[in-house]
Amino acid sequence: MAVGKNKRLSKGKKGQKKRVVDPFTRKEWFDIKAPSTFENRNVGKTLVNKSTGLKSASDALKGRVVEVCLADLQGSEDHSFRKIKLRVDEVQGKNLLTNFHGMDFTTDKLRSMVRKWQTLIEANVTVKTSDDYVLRIFAIAFTRKQANQVKRHSYAQSSHIRAIRKVISEILTKEVQGSTLAQLTSKLIPEVINKEIENATKDIFPLQNIHVRKVKLLKQPKFDVGALMALHGEGSGEEKGKKVTGFKDEVLETV
């Protein structure tokens, strides 16, 4: 007899199969909604464990960040190289209301722009928007040949690079400080800032492939439900009650 073995314990039946539970029965689906800044607001679906006890499904979803291709949000393949990050801020039934959380370029697009015989110029600024979002914005540009140029390359001097970087930083700061986060997002989609940088730097050195390649959210203000609803086109920042009409007081004769 082995030490510590209890003969009274009943043994399980040999060959008995273990009960298999489908993990998806404990989960539920939610629809992700993009802000009204984008043309296609239906981003997709996400999974989360069902609410049990003190654990709420909405608490697990708030703060979740999803990455979406801008081509899917705008319905155009011209934006296929840009990725948009959306953060879940509010849960309404089965819908998740999101806000802009950042932007980035795909790796293949960045590598395809880097070529020989040209100078790469990068600049970044940390700015606060008019609605108190602190963003770090990265811009990228490449030099190109001047008109009637004979030389094979289009290298810029250090003085040109410093001057161009200063102009880019000033334009980015001006555009961000005078815009809300939603307004800035609408400027990034058609690349309005890029055209402004190209016109401002053409007297210093001609540029090409100018892009705001990355936007990083560093700090956000206190959460405001009204502002989020206005961003999704589901209400204004102010909620006002309506006067009730057609109501008559009824007098109870007996209690």
Curated annotation (Swiss-Prot):
<keyword id="KW-0597">Phosphoprotein</keyword>
<dbReference type="Pfam" id="PF01015">
    <property type="entry name" value="Ribosomal_S3Ae"/>
</dbReference>
<comment type="subunit">
    <text>Component of the small ribosomal subunit (SSU). Mature yeast ribosomes consist of a small (40S) and a large (60S) subunit. The 40S small subunit contains 1 molecule of ribosomal RNA (18S rRNA) and 33 different proteins (encoded by 57 genes). The large 60S subunit contains 3 rRNA molecules (25S, 5.8S and 5S rRNA) and 46 different proteins (encoded by 81 genes). eS1 interacts directly with uS11 and eS26, which form part of the mRNA exit tunnel.</text>
</comment>
<feature type="modified residue" description="Phosphothreonine">
    <location>
        <position position="254"/>
    </location>
</feature>
<feature type="compositionally biased region" description="Basic residues">
    <location>
        <begin position="1"/>
        <end position="18"/>
    </location>
</feature>
<dbReference type="InterPro" id="IPR027500">
    <property type="entry name" value="Ribosomal_eS1_euk"/>
</dbReference>
<keyword id="KW-1017">Isopeptide bond</keyword>
<dbReference type="GO" id="GO:0003735">
    <property type="term" value="F:structural constituent of ribosome"/>
</dbReference>
<feature type="cross-link" description="Glycyl lysine isopeptide (Lys-Gly) (interchain with G-Cter in ubiquitin)">
    <location>
        <position position="248"/>
    </location>
</feature>
<feature type="modified residue" description="N-acetylalanine; partial">
    <location>
        <position position="2"/>
    </location>
</feature>
<dbReference type="GO" id="GO:0000462">
    <property type="term" value="P:maturation of SSU-rRNA from tricistronic rRNA transcript (SSU-rRNA, 5.8S rRNA, LSU-rRNA)"/>
</dbReference>
<dbReference type="InterPro" id="IPR018281">
    <property type="entry name" value="Ribosomal_eS1_CS"/>
</dbReference>
<dbReference type="GO" id="GO:0030686">
    <property type="term" value="C:90S preribosome"/>
</dbReference>
<dbReference type="GO" id="GO:0022627">
    <property type="term" value="C:cytosolic small ribosomal subunit"/>
</dbReference>
<dbReference type="InterPro" id="IPR001593">
    <property type="entry name" value="Ribosomal_eS1"/>
</dbReference>
<keyword id="KW-0007">Acetylation</keyword>
<keyword id="KW-0687">Ribonucleoprotein</keyword>
<feature type="modified residue" description="Phosphothreonine">
    <location>
        <position position="245"/>
    </location>
</feature>
<comment type="similarity">
    <text>Belongs to the eukaryotic ribosomal protein eS1 family.</text>
</comment>
<dbReference type="GO" id="GO:0002181">
    <property type="term" value="P:cytoplasmic translation"/>
</dbReference>
<keyword id="KW-0832">Ubl conjugation</keyword>
<keyword id="KW-0963">Cytoplasm</keyword>
<protein>
    <recommendedName>
        <fullName>Small ribosomal subunit protein eS1A</fullName>
    </recommendedName>
</protein>
<comment type="function">
    <text>Component of the ribosome, a large ribonucleoprotein complex responsible for the synthesis of proteins in the cell. The small ribosomal subunit (SSU) binds messenger RNAs (mRNAs) and translates the encoded message by selecting cognate aminoacyl-transfer RNA (tRNA) molecules. The large subunit (LSU) contains the ribosomal catalytic site termed the peptidyl transferase center (PTC), which catalyzes the formation of peptide bonds, thereby polymerizing the amino acids delivered by tRNAs into a polypeptide chain.</text>
</comment>
<dbReference type="GO" id="GO:0005829">
    <property type="term" value="C:cytosol"/>
</dbReference>
<keyword id="KW-0689">Ribosomal protein</keyword>
<feature type="region of interest" description="Disordered">
    <location>
        <begin position="1"/>
        <end position="20"/>
    </location>
</feature>
